[in-house]
Amino acid sequence: ILEFTRQGIPVERLVAFLDNLMDNPSKRAVDELYGFLESSGLPITDDGHFLAYKAVTKDYMDKHSRSISNAVGEVISMPRNQVSDNKEDTCSHGLHFAAHEYASGFGRGDDRMMVMKINPRDVVSIPSDYNNQKGRCCEYTVHAEVCSCLRVDSQRRRPTGVQLCEG
């Protein structure tokens, strides 16, 4: 934050992010989240939340149980103590979010790619075996639907711009 301030880069969203992060009761999640965001290239919003991705079915249902609607505007939550906080449990209980590259690997045919808005306080774990590409949380808001990837950074294989669906 100090370096950004010296360079004249606005820091308000980072300050808001840190405020939200400090509300997270998990030291491990606090320690791991920024590294996840940095390596995934995921943005921090003005209110200090962050955006991540999730592949869902064509009718906006989750791909695992096909019982949770992930339509834009939905707030999805579960009790925090039912989310696996063990980062060594790579596929386990919880609400999943991911970097674009990882999430796009789950999309098939007419599946949809959604943008999730997540408060840092709700992050429970960042699994250890996916190079900081996915995580688990206890709550997220479905923020938008991705209609297309505008550009992909060929070296880092991540989108540098996405087009969100209108409506």
Regions found by a protein language model. Name each.
Residues I1, T141-S154, P159-E166:
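Acidic, proline/serine/threonine- and glycine-rich low-complexity intrinsically disordered segments
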Residues L2-T90:
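ADP-ribose/NAD+-binding catalytic cleft of ART/PARP-like enzymes
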Residues S69-A71, N132-R136, R158-T160:
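Generic alpha-helical propensity signal that fires on short helical segments
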Residues P79-V152:
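ADP-ribosyltransferase catalytic core
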